Amino acid sequence: MCGTHVDIAAPLVWRCPRATDSDPHHALQLVQGTTPLRATDDANPFVAFQPYLAWDSFGAANGMTEAARTSMIRQLDIDIAGVAGTGFHVTPFDRADSLSEALGFTEDGGVWVKDETDNVAGSHKARHLVTILLHLLTTESLGLAPWTDEADRPALAIASCGNAAFAAATLAAAVKWPLRVFVPPHADPVVIAGLRQLDADIVECPRRDSEPAGDPCIHRFREAVATGAIPFTVQGTENMWCLDGGRTIGWEMARHLEENVVGPPLDRLFVQVGAGTLAASTINGFRMSGVTPRLHAVQTDSCAPLDRAYAKVQGVGGPKAAAAHWSECMWPWEHVGNSAADGILDDETYDWIPVVRAMTEGNGGPIVVTEAQVLEANDLGRATTGINASHTGTAGLAGLLAARDSIDNDERVAVIFSGVSRAALR
Protein backbone atom coordinates (compact mmCIF):
# COMPACT_ATOMS: atom_id res chain seq x y z
CA MET A 1 0.00 0.00 0.00
CA CYS A 2 3.07 2.21 0.25
CA GLY A 3 3.80 1.46 -3.40
CA THR A 4 6.44 -1.20 -2.78
CA HIS A 5 6.29 -4.14 -5.20
CA VAL A 6 7.64 -7.62 -4.47
CA ASP A 7 8.35 -10.01 -7.34
CA ILE A 8 6.15 -13.12 -7.21
CA ALA A 9 9.32 -15.23 -7.63
CA ALA A 10 10.84 -13.96 -4.37
CA PRO A 11 10.88 -16.69 -1.69
CA LEU A 12 10.02 -16.31 1.98
CA VAL A 13 8.69 -12.76 1.81
CA TRP A 14 5.92 -12.37 4.36
CA ARG A 15 5.50 -8.64 4.94
CA CYS A 16 6.20 -5.42 3.11
CA PRO A 17 9.99 -4.93 3.08
CA ARG A 18 9.46 -1.38 4.32
CA ALA A 19 7.66 -2.49 7.49
CA THR A 20 9.70 -1.99 10.66
CA ASP A 21 9.07 -2.06 14.40
CA SER A 22 8.80 1.73 14.39
CA ASP A 23 6.77 1.84 11.16
CA PRO A 24 4.70 -1.38 11.09
CA HIS A 25 1.73 -0.05 9.15
CA HIS A 26 2.42 -1.58 5.76
CA ALA A 27 0.51 -4.39 4.08
CA LEU A 28 1.26 -6.30 0.91
CA GLN A 29 -1.73 -7.12 -1.31
CA LEU A 30 -1.92 -9.75 -4.02
CA VAL A 31 -2.22 -8.39 -7.55
CA GLN A 32 -5.07 -10.26 -9.20
CA GLY A 33 -5.30 -10.79 -12.92
CA THR A 34 -8.30 -9.85 -15.02
CA THR A 35 -8.58 -13.26 -16.69
CA PRO A 36 -12.14 -14.65 -16.45
CA LEU A 37 -12.49 -17.14 -13.61
CA ARG A 38 -12.61 -20.64 -15.06
CA ALA A 39 -12.13 -23.63 -12.79
CA THR A 40 -11.90 -27.36 -13.37
CA ASP A 41 -14.34 -29.80 -11.80
CA ASP A 42 -11.74 -31.13 -9.37
CA ALA A 43 -13.17 -31.62 -5.87
CA ASN A 44 -10.09 -30.00 -4.32
CA PRO A 45 -10.41 -26.21 -4.70
CA PHE A 46 -6.63 -25.80 -4.66
CA VAL A 47 -6.48 -27.93 -7.81
CA ALA A 48 -9.68 -26.58 -9.34
CA PHE A 49 -8.46 -22.97 -9.04
CA GLN A 50 -4.74 -23.73 -9.20
CA PRO A 51 -3.86 -21.33 -12.08
CA TYR A 52 -5.26 -18.37 -10.13
CA LEU A 53 -3.34 -18.98 -6.90
CA ALA A 54 -0.30 -16.86 -6.12
CA TRP A 55 1.66 -19.76 -4.65
CA ASP A 56 1.24 -21.56 -8.00
CA SER A 57 2.63 -18.51 -9.81
CA PHE A 58 5.55 -18.50 -7.37
CA GLY A 59 6.37 -22.10 -8.24
CA ALA A 60 6.02 -21.48 -11.97
CA ALA A 61 8.20 -18.37 -11.80
CA ASN A 62 10.96 -20.48 -10.23
CA GLY A 63 10.84 -23.23 -12.85
CA MET A 64 8.56 -25.78 -11.18
CA THR A 65 6.42 -27.63 -13.72
CA GLU A 66 2.64 -27.57 -13.61
CA ALA A 67 2.57 -31.32 -13.03
CA ALA A 68 4.95 -30.99 -10.09
CA ARG A 69 2.86 -28.20 -8.59
CA THR A 70 -0.33 -30.23 -8.87
CA SER A 71 1.43 -33.26 -7.40
CA MET A 72 2.52 -31.17 -4.43
CA ILE A 73 -1.07 -30.13 -3.71
CA ARG A 74 -2.32 -33.69 -3.92
CA GLN A 75 0.40 -35.15 -1.70
CA LEU A 76 -0.07 -32.42 0.90
CA ASP A 77 -3.81 -33.04 0.85
CA ILE A 78 -3.22 -36.74 1.51
CA ASP A 79 -0.93 -35.87 4.43
CA ILE A 80 -3.49 -33.43 5.85
CA ALA A 81 -6.30 -35.97 5.56
CA GLY A 82 -4.15 -38.41 7.50
CA VAL A 83 -4.25 -36.01 10.45
CA ALA A 84 -7.60 -34.26 10.06
CA GLY A 85 -9.67 -37.11 8.67
CA THR A 86 -10.51 -35.02 5.61
CA GLY A 87 -8.66 -33.15 2.94
CA PHE A 88 -9.74 -29.98 1.18
CA HIS A 89 -12.96 -30.08 -0.82
CA VAL A 90 -15.42 -27.60 -2.26
CA THR A 91 -17.80 -26.89 0.61
CA PRO A 92 -21.59 -26.58 0.31
CA PHE A 93 -23.16 -23.27 -0.71
CA ASP A 94 -26.91 -23.44 -1.11
CA ARG A 95 -30.07 -21.49 -0.49
CA ALA A 96 -31.23 -22.19 3.06
CA ASP A 97 -34.96 -22.49 2.42
CA SER A 98 -36.14 -22.75 6.03
CA LEU A 99 -33.91 -19.89 7.14
CA SER A 100 -35.06 -17.77 4.20
CA GLU A 101 -38.69 -18.44 5.06
CA ALA A 102 -38.13 -17.68 8.74
CA LEU A 103 -36.68 -14.30 7.80
CA GLY A 104 -39.52 -13.46 5.43
CA PHE A 105 -37.73 -13.62 2.08
CA THR A 106 -39.64 -14.40 -1.10
CA GLU A 107 -38.85 -17.37 -3.32
CA ASP A 108 -36.94 -15.04 -5.65
CA GLY A 109 -34.80 -13.82 -2.77
CA GLY A 110 -33.39 -15.61 0.23
CA VAL A 111 -30.31 -16.52 2.22
CA TRP A 112 -27.48 -18.63 0.79
CA VAL A 113 -25.22 -20.30 3.37
CA LYS A 114 -21.59 -21.26 2.76
CA ASP A 115 -20.88 -24.12 5.17
CA GLU A 116 -17.23 -24.39 6.26
CA THR A 117 -17.86 -26.53 9.34
CA ASP A 118 -16.76 -29.78 7.66
CA ASN A 119 -13.60 -28.30 6.18
CA VAL A 120 -10.10 -29.21 7.37
CA ALA A 121 -9.89 -28.69 11.17
CA GLY A 122 -13.53 -27.59 11.25
CA SER A 123 -13.31 -24.08 9.81
CA HIS A 124 -12.20 -21.88 6.93
CA LYS A 125 -8.85 -21.12 8.59
CA ALA A 126 -6.89 -23.94 6.97
CA ARG A 127 -7.64 -22.45 3.53
CA HIS A 128 -5.59 -19.40 4.46
CA LEU A 129 -2.75 -21.34 6.03
CA VAL A 130 -2.29 -23.99 3.37
CA THR A 131 -1.01 -21.50 0.79
CA ILE A 132 1.66 -20.42 3.26
CA LEU A 133 2.59 -24.07 3.67
CA LEU A 134 2.61 -24.68 -0.09
CA HIS A 135 4.93 -21.70 -0.50
CA LEU A 136 7.26 -23.16 2.13
CA LEU A 137 7.25 -26.66 0.66
CA THR A 138 7.85 -25.26 -2.82
CA THR A 139 10.74 -23.17 -1.52
CA GLU A 140 12.26 -26.28 0.05
CA SER A 141 11.77 -28.48 -3.00
CA LEU A 142 13.46 -25.92 -5.26
CA GLY A 143 16.46 -25.55 -2.94
CA LEU A 144 15.65 -21.90 -2.20
CA ALA A 145 15.33 -22.26 1.57
CA PRO A 146 18.23 -21.26 3.85
CA TRP A 147 17.94 -24.63 5.59
CA THR A 148 18.85 -27.89 3.85
CA ASP A 149 17.49 -30.48 6.26
CA GLU A 150 13.97 -30.86 7.63
CA ALA A 151 15.46 -31.12 11.10
CA ASP A 152 16.73 -27.56 10.72
CA ARG A 153 13.39 -26.03 9.79
CA PRO A 154 12.60 -22.88 11.76
CA ALA A 155 9.46 -23.15 13.86
CA LEU A 156 6.14 -21.92 12.58
CA ALA A 157 4.41 -19.40 14.85
CA ILE A 158 0.83 -18.27 15.34
CA ALA A 159 -1.05 -16.14 17.88
CA SER A 160 -4.47 -17.73 18.33
CA CYS A 161 -6.57 -19.63 20.83
CA GLY A 162 -9.27 -20.84 18.47
CA ASN A 163 -9.88 -22.20 15.00
CA ALA A 164 -6.76 -20.66 13.49
CA ALA A 165 -4.54 -22.35 16.07
CA PHE A 166 -6.25 -25.69 15.55
CA ALA A 167 -5.91 -25.39 11.77
CA ALA A 168 -2.25 -24.39 12.08
CA ALA A 169 -1.48 -27.33 14.35
CA THR A 170 -3.28 -29.72 12.00
CA LEU A 171 -1.34 -28.58 8.95
CA ALA A 172 1.97 -28.46 10.83
CA ALA A 173 1.46 -32.00 12.11
CA ALA A 174 0.71 -33.20 8.57
CA VAL A 175 4.21 -32.23 7.42
CA LYS A 176 5.94 -32.68 10.80
CA TRP A 177 6.89 -29.00 11.04
CA PRO A 178 7.39 -27.59 14.58
CA LEU A 179 4.78 -25.04 15.64
CA ARG A 180 4.62 -22.54 18.50
CA VAL A 181 1.17 -21.28 19.46
CA PHE A 182 0.89 -18.10 21.51
CA VAL A 183 -2.30 -18.17 23.58
CA PRO A 184 -3.90 -16.01 26.31
CA PRO A 185 -4.17 -17.32 29.88
CA HIS A 186 -7.94 -17.81 29.45
CA ALA A 187 -7.65 -20.01 26.32
CA ASP A 188 -10.35 -22.64 25.83
CA PRO A 189 -9.22 -25.92 27.49
CA VAL A 190 -10.78 -27.89 24.62
CA VAL A 191 -8.60 -26.08 22.09
CA ILE A 192 -5.50 -26.41 24.28
CA ALA A 193 -6.08 -30.16 24.62
CA GLY A 194 -6.44 -30.48 20.86
CA LEU A 195 -3.25 -28.51 20.27
CA ARG A 196 -1.32 -30.73 22.67
CA GLN A 197 -2.56 -33.84 20.85
CA LEU A 198 -1.10 -32.35 17.67
CA ASP A 199 2.28 -31.76 19.38
CA ALA A 200 2.11 -27.96 19.24
CA ASP A 201 4.35 -25.99 21.59
CA ILE A 202 1.94 -23.80 23.59
CA VAL A 203 3.16 -20.48 24.98
CA GLU A 204 0.87 -18.69 27.44
CA CYS A 205 0.99 -14.91 27.13
CA PRO A 206 -0.14 -12.88 30.14
CA ARG A 207 -0.14 -9.12 29.72
CA ARG A 208 3.02 -7.36 30.83
CA ASP A 209 2.73 -4.03 32.63
CA SER A 210 5.44 -2.47 30.49
CA GLU A 211 4.13 -3.40 27.04
CA PRO A 212 2.14 -1.18 24.67
CA ALA A 213 -1.55 -1.55 23.87
CA GLY A 214 -2.60 -4.52 21.80
CA ASP A 215 -2.86 -8.27 22.14
CA PRO A 216 -0.01 -9.76 24.26
CA CYS A 217 -0.16 -12.90 22.10
CA ILE A 218 0.55 -10.80 19.01
CA HIS A 219 3.45 -9.12 20.80
CA ARG A 220 5.04 -12.49 21.73
CA PHE A 221 4.32 -13.84 18.24
CA ARG A 222 6.11 -10.89 16.63
CA GLU A 223 9.06 -11.34 18.96
CA ALA A 224 9.31 -14.98 17.86
CA VAL A 225 9.19 -13.99 14.18
CA ALA A 226 11.88 -11.38 14.79
CA THR A 227 14.17 -14.15 16.05
CA GLY A 228 13.58 -16.48 13.10
CA ALA A 229 10.16 -18.13 13.41
CA ILE A 230 7.94 -18.25 10.32
CA PRO A 231 4.62 -16.37 10.65
CA PHE A 232 2.02 -19.09 10.12
CA THR A 233 -0.93 -16.86 10.70
CA VAL A 234 -4.27 -15.67 9.39
CA GLN A 235 -3.42 -11.98 9.30
CA GLY A 236 -2.34 -10.62 5.95
CA THR A 237 -0.29 -7.89 7.60
CA GLU A 238 1.93 -10.59 9.13
CA ASN A 239 2.00 -13.00 6.19
CA MET A 240 0.41 -11.95 2.93
CA TRP A 241 0.34 -15.55 1.63
CA CYS A 242 -2.68 -16.25 3.87
CA LEU A 243 -4.70 -13.94 1.62
CA ASP A 244 -4.05 -16.30 -1.29
CA GLY A 245 -5.88 -19.44 -0.20
CA GLY A 246 -8.70 -17.51 1.41
CA ARG A 247 -9.84 -16.38 -2.02
CA THR A 248 -11.01 -19.92 -2.79
CA ILE A 249 -14.09 -19.27 -0.64
CA GLY A 250 -15.18 -16.39 -2.86
CA TRP A 251 -14.27 -18.31 -6.01
CA GLU A 252 -16.36 -21.30 -4.96
CA MET A 253 -19.34 -19.12 -4.10
CA ALA A 254 -19.13 -17.13 -7.34
CA ARG A 255 -18.77 -20.25 -9.49
CA HIS A 256 -21.71 -21.97 -7.81
CA LEU A 257 -23.96 -18.96 -8.34
CA GLU A 258 -22.93 -18.67 -11.98
CA GLU A 259 -23.39 -22.35 -12.79
CA ASN A 260 -26.30 -23.39 -10.59
CA VAL A 261 -28.49 -20.43 -9.63
CA VAL A 262 -30.95 -18.91 -12.10
CA GLY A 263 -31.87 -15.26 -11.82
CA PRO A 264 -30.22 -12.10 -10.56
CA PRO A 265 -26.81 -12.13 -8.89
CA LEU A 266 -26.10 -12.01 -5.18
CA ASP A 267 -27.02 -8.64 -3.66
CA ARG A 268 -25.23 -8.70 -0.31
CA LEU A 269 -22.60 -10.65 1.58
CA PHE A 270 -22.45 -10.58 5.39
CA VAL A 271 -19.08 -11.64 6.82
CA GLN A 272 -18.06 -11.79 10.47
CA VAL A 273 -14.85 -9.87 11.07
CA GLY A 274 -12.09 -10.33 13.62
CA ALA A 275 -8.73 -9.87 11.91
CA GLY A 276 -10.57 -9.12 8.65
CA THR A 277 -8.77 -11.72 6.56
CA LEU A 278 -11.87 -13.78 5.77
CA ALA A 279 -13.78 -10.76 4.50
CA ALA A 280 -10.81 -9.38 2.55
CA SER A 281 -10.06 -12.71 0.87
CA THR A 282 -13.66 -13.63 0.10
CA ILE A 283 -14.57 -10.32 -1.51
CA ASN A 284 -11.34 -10.38 -3.55
CA GLY A 285 -12.34 -13.82 -4.77
CA PHE A 286 -15.71 -12.48 -5.85
CA ARG A 287 -14.05 -9.62 -7.72
CA MET A 288 -12.39 -12.05 -10.12
CA SER A 289 -15.82 -13.41 -11.02
CA GLY A 290 -16.91 -10.01 -12.31
CA VAL A 291 -19.91 -9.87 -9.96
CA THR A 292 -19.29 -8.38 -6.52
CA PRO A 293 -22.04 -8.20 -3.88
CA ARG A 294 -22.34 -5.40 -1.36
CA LEU A 295 -20.11 -6.31 1.58
CA HIS A 296 -21.24 -5.93 5.19
CA ALA A 297 -18.53 -6.60 7.78
CA VAL A 298 -20.03 -7.73 11.08
CA GLN A 299 -18.56 -7.13 14.54
CA THR A 300 -20.04 -7.27 18.04
CA ASP A 301 -20.53 -4.26 20.28
CA SER A 302 -17.97 -5.85 22.62
CA CYS A 303 -15.18 -5.09 20.15
CA ALA A 304 -15.73 -3.06 16.97
CA PRO A 305 -12.49 -1.43 15.78
CA LEU A 306 -13.44 -1.81 12.11
CA ASP A 307 -16.68 0.12 12.51
CA ARG A 308 -14.73 2.93 14.17
CA ALA A 309 -12.09 2.88 11.43
CA TYR A 310 -14.74 2.96 8.70
CA ALA A 311 -16.15 6.17 10.17
CA LYS A 312 -12.69 7.70 10.56
CA VAL A 313 -11.70 6.89 6.97
CA GLN A 314 -14.53 8.97 5.57
CA GLY A 315 -12.95 12.02 7.19
CA VAL A 316 -9.39 11.53 5.89
CA GLY A 317 -10.09 11.27 2.19
CA GLY A 318 -11.68 7.83 1.86
CA PRO A 319 -10.17 4.36 1.40
CA LYS A 320 -7.48 5.46 -1.05
CA ALA A 321 -6.02 7.69 1.66
CA ALA A 322 -6.51 5.20 4.49
CA ALA A 323 -3.00 3.72 4.47
CA ALA A 324 -1.46 7.15 4.98
CA HIS A 325 -3.71 7.67 8.02
CA TRP A 326 -3.48 4.18 9.50
CA SER A 327 -2.82 5.23 13.11
CA GLU A 328 -5.61 7.79 12.98
CA CYS A 329 -8.15 5.20 11.85
CA MET A 330 -7.15 1.81 13.26
CA TRP A 331 -5.84 1.20 16.75
CA PRO A 332 -6.49 -1.46 19.43
CA TRP A 333 -9.97 -1.47 20.95
CA GLU A 334 -9.46 -0.15 24.45
CA HIS A 335 -11.82 -2.38 26.43
CA VAL A 336 -12.63 -5.69 24.78
CA GLY A 337 -15.78 -7.18 26.25
CA ASN A 338 -17.07 -10.72 26.25
CA SER A 339 -19.07 -12.47 23.56
CA ALA A 340 -20.15 -15.97 22.65
CA ALA A 341 -18.61 -15.07 19.26
CA ASP A 342 -15.19 -14.94 20.87
CA GLY A 343 -13.39 -15.71 17.61
CA ILE A 344 -14.03 -12.18 16.32
CA LEU A 345 -12.88 -10.27 19.38
CA ASP A 346 -9.55 -9.22 17.81
CA ASP A 347 -8.75 -5.84 19.30
CA GLU A 348 -7.44 -4.74 15.90
CA THR A 349 -8.82 -5.54 12.46
CA TYR A 350 -5.44 -6.16 10.89
CA ASP A 351 -6.64 -6.51 7.28
CA TRP A 352 -8.97 -3.55 7.60
CA ILE A 353 -8.00 -1.49 4.56
CA PRO A 354 -9.17 -3.90 1.82
CA VAL A 355 -12.39 -4.49 3.78
CA VAL A 356 -13.11 -0.78 4.16
CA ARG A 357 -12.31 -0.23 0.50
CA ALA A 358 -14.66 -3.01 -0.61
CA MET A 359 -17.49 -1.76 1.59
CA THR A 360 -17.09 1.82 0.39
CA GLU A 361 -16.73 1.04 -3.31
CA GLY A 362 -19.60 -1.47 -3.25
CA ASN A 363 -22.00 0.67 -1.20
CA GLY A 364 -21.96 -1.76 1.71
CA GLY A 365 -20.93 -0.92 5.25
CA PRO A 366 -20.09 -2.30 8.69
CA ILE A 367 -22.69 -3.64 11.08
CA VAL A 368 -22.25 -3.81 14.85
CA VAL A 369 -24.46 -6.41 16.53
CA THR A 370 -25.61 -6.92 20.09
CA GLU A 371 -24.92 -10.04 22.11
CA ALA A 372 -28.62 -10.87 21.93
CA GLN A 373 -28.36 -10.90 18.13
CA VAL A 374 -25.25 -13.11 18.28
CA LEU A 375 -27.18 -15.65 20.37
CA GLU A 376 -30.35 -15.41 18.27
CA ALA A 377 -28.41 -15.92 15.04
CA ASN A 378 -26.79 -19.09 16.32
CA ASP A 379 -30.06 -20.54 17.58
CA LEU A 380 -31.87 -19.67 14.34
CA GLY A 381 -29.06 -20.74 12.04
CA ARG A 382 -28.58 -24.12 13.69
CA ALA A 383 -32.32 -24.82 13.98
CA THR A 384 -33.18 -23.99 10.37
CA THR A 385 -30.13 -25.45 8.60
CA GLY A 386 -29.01 -28.31 10.84
CA ILE A 387 -25.44 -27.03 10.60
CA ASN A 388 -23.43 -27.43 13.81
CA ALA A 389 -21.85 -23.98 13.67
CA SER A 390 -20.34 -22.02 16.54
CA HIS A 391 -21.46 -18.55 17.61
CA THR A 392 -18.44 -17.11 15.82
CA GLY A 393 -19.38 -19.16 12.78
CA THR A 394 -22.89 -17.70 12.62
CA ALA A 395 -21.99 -14.12 13.55
CA GLY A 396 -22.43 -12.99 9.94
CA LEU A 397 -26.06 -14.06 10.23
CA ALA A 398 -26.34 -11.81 13.29
CA GLY A 399 -25.45 -8.94 10.97
CA LEU A 400 -28.24 -9.96 8.62
CA LEU A 401 -30.69 -10.01 11.54
CA ALA A 402 -29.59 -6.51 12.54
CA ALA A 403 -30.03 -5.19 8.99
CA ARG A 404 -33.11 -7.20 8.01
CA ASP A 405 -35.59 -4.30 8.15
CA SER A 406 -33.58 -2.42 5.50
CA ILE A 407 -33.34 -5.38 3.08
CA ASP A 408 -36.00 -6.03 0.46
CA ASN A 409 -37.74 -9.39 0.63
CA ASP A 410 -36.60 -10.36 -2.86
CA GLU A 411 -32.92 -9.63 -2.26
CA ARG A 412 -30.40 -12.45 -2.42
CA VAL A 413 -27.93 -12.45 0.44
CA ALA A 414 -25.19 -14.77 1.65
CA VAL A 415 -23.55 -15.65 4.94
CA ILE A 416 -20.61 -17.90 5.79
CA PHE A 417 -20.98 -20.40 8.62
CA SER A 418 -17.25 -20.32 9.14
CA GLY A 419 -16.57 -22.80 11.92
CA VAL A 420 -17.91 -25.83 13.76
CA SER A 421 -19.14 -25.74 17.34
CA ARG A 422 -16.87 -27.63 19.72
CA ALA A 423 -19.28 -27.19 22.65
CA ALA A 424 -20.02 -30.92 22.81
CA LEU A 425 -16.34 -31.56 23.58
CA ARG A 426 -16.43 -29.50 26.77
Predicted stretch roles:
Residues 150-158, 164-222, 307-313, 425-426:
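Active-site-proximal loop->helix
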Residues 219-289, 375-381:
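Active-site/ligand-binding-proximal alpha/beta "capping" segment
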Residues 142-184, 265-278, 295, 413-417:
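A short, small-residue-rich loop immediately preceding and capping a beta-strand
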Residues 199, 207-234, 288-388:
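Active-site/ligand-binding loops adjacent to catalytic centers
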Residues 398-426:
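Catalytic phosphate/nucleotide-handling subdomain of diverse soluble enzymes
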Residues 56-145:
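Positively charged, low-complexity intrinsically disordered leader regions
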